Amino acid sequence: MTPNNAVRLDDDPQETREWLESIESVLSTEGRPRAHYLIDQLLDFDVARHGDFYGRVTTPYVNTIPVDRQLPYPGNLAIERRTNAFIRWNAMAMVLRAGKHSGVGGHIATYASAAVLYDVGFDHFFRGRTDSFDGDLVYIQGHSSPGIYGRAYLEGRISEAQLDNFRREAGGEGLSSYPHPRLMPDFWQFPTVSMGLGPITAAYQARFMRYLEFRDLKQHQGRKVWAFLGDGEMDQPESLAAISVAGREKLDNLIFVVNCNLQRLDGPVRGNAKVIQEFESLYRAAGCNVIKVIWGGGWDALLEKDHSGLLRQRMMECVDGDYQNYKSQNGAYVREHFFGKYPELLALVADMSDDEIWKLSRGGHDPDKVYNAYAAAVRHKGQPTVILAKTVKGFGMGEAGEGQNINHQLKKMGAEAVKAFRDRFGLEVADDQLDEIPYLKPAADSEEARYFAARRQALGGYVPARHTAVQSLQIPELSAFATQLKDTGERAISTTMAFVRILGTLLKDPHLGKLIVPIVPDESRTFGMESLFRQIGIHSAVGQLYTPQDAGQLSYYKESKDGQIMQEGLNESGAISSWIAASTSYSNHGLMTVPFYIFYSMFGFQRVGDLAWAAGDARARGFLLGATAGRTTLMGEGLQHDDGHSHILSSVIPCCVSYDPTFAYELAVIIREGMRRMYVEQEDIYYYITLLNENYPHPAMPEGVEEGILKGMYPLSSHPQAQVQLMGSGSILREVIAASELLDKDFAIHSNVWSVTSLTELRRDGHAVERWNLLHPQNEPRTSYVEQCLAGQTGPVVVATDYMKLFADQIRPFVHGRRFVALGTDGFGQSDTRETLREFFEVDRHFIVLATLKALADDGLIGRENVSEAISRYGINVDKANPVAV
């Protein structure tokens, strides 16, 4: 196999010319499709006989769009260069001023490399939201935020005081370090940091837009999703996942603009290779339309004179480490080390000065080249487009950081470097003002200001801008879930089954049904959802082009363009990205959808925690359902599947409301309240609810427990002479109930049993009360909900859950004046039966009894012989392994 950048020798130039002349003849008489067909036939002929063929998957290291196919630039380049200079300066100034006065820093080099990529888009392509058009969606590369603020300052949307408060948000007048809708809810639309989140969420956003159109929830408007990405972040697995879905789904509404400045945070992205060629091969293989913007217009004349192809060969020979180094040097160095390898190339630039050679730019810094790439991208049909734009990191920073490995961390520039920056971009800043680094904008009545405003007006308004005005939904009353509120009798069901029935009720609701978005990562049958296949269908952009194997069955695998289920395959990152798109639809599409993403709970927050955090940042509204939850509840799977900590992980996300219900009625109350809060009151929160695959009978909902269910705890059973308070959630609540019965039968100890539906919400309530009391020392102290529930009750508190002890420990600070015992499933999961696992992790009914007796004995309320009796009675192995140590 011949490597892509190798130069292959021609043994018979005459024969080669004859073949090329033949192809040229076909091109001129019958066009490119016929020529490509003939070439494909030749390749197929060879492969059929020899079984393999080395085919080049990359194109030469030159611009994809030739000069003779370029469109004339539609804007006033002189004015745009002027406004571009203002924005560049302001982006630099706000970082330098922040570093000078507060030390909070910022990044200069990324936007410096991408300024033209953004400005051409803002001036000519990015369409804002209007009354008749929903607007394009633009994902801004996180480290470019200073430039976006600099532009907003020129637009009059951000004040000088706000620029001075860059990265100083606590006072309420600052600007967030990166795009964060949670912190700037009227400005930023999409969180794109940490790196890799932008590509995958943008790709699934584009797919969700198509989903809405296929289901007739939104009209096709020709909207585009633009994602600005860095070449370094494309190494993230999420970035590569985005490649697959974009090509497979033929998302021609998606445009990736990859800023190939060849540098990541510490050094070159691919110092020993060519990152643009690598990306081209990846994206082309995935079915994307790739446009390379490598060289600025200054190279056109040289390439035209390159009759031998030696310049193109030299361009291919150099690796990215060379190209980065060239831009950290000067024109003389480039002449010697780039052109100087071959005498013919030195002759090619003999009439150029070193300064002229130095000014030969990268394609991403040439507005004309960038415009043509964008114009081709928006015209292209049937494929997503990826624009690979070569730039220089730190462009314009000169010796202070241009093309240097350290430029990502640069927060400061010396006086001479600032002066050089000013002179390079022709800005009018007096020498005596340089120390102040003033912000710049054109005069309000200037030609630049009028042009600048007119461009955005022509494109429909400002971008980015986040919109939230949307009509609240009409949700069903709790009585709609009457089946879940009733006693199941002897019929045993799981809470997962109860959820599927609740979902079925919602899908049939005349007001809400079509807005429900079920999302599953290839586990529908595990969760008992296969009945929905035929009922509402599985979404597929091409419908169903085959006869499914189970076509004769009632619940066959039905795919359709207007299918409602988003079946994501074994792809949790993609599934939650679809969920993020659906859960922010109210803002991005002016339509409130109700997404339910159900997954193995172990493969939720642990697997995609960064995306779950980003969902909170994006102000997502929706339901996450962690099925097969609990360390001991999922039988036979073991260490990697048994979840004993998803509630710990969900608890760290401030806007995530988490519940671990045991009974169907609890689940119905929680889901109904979640819909009220998110889709009627429009709170920017989302819900995480764990579901079980253990079947057992469910009681009817007792009177008056709704408030307790939602606040986090309520009494399930009470005894007037209760000596201890037993609490549990999820599957272990039933062990707590059984333990209460054993205590009464075997030891004549009475207890109250509490269903603790949300230890996380109880903790948050307790901390809120503590904070209020801290800040209001002269007022009557408030009491937490836990304290209110336990008021008038006696005895220690024993809490048992199917999660780590830390989960129960959340309420320890709010249990005052009594002993508190937490039982949990710390340690790695094991594969076994539920009964064995609960004994192994010491959360079964016998260990709950033992822990209760020990607490009572420690308080001097019973003798210690009772503890020993329990060990003997229940056959507890006191020498068993500590589950944490296994």
Model-found features: residue ranges?
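N-terminal amphipathic, basic-rich helices that act as targeting or association modules
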Residues: 2-155, 421, 492-509, 513, ...
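Cofactor-binding active-site loop characterized by glycine-rich and histidine/acidic residues
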Residues: 69-70, 74-87, 91-101, 107-249, ...
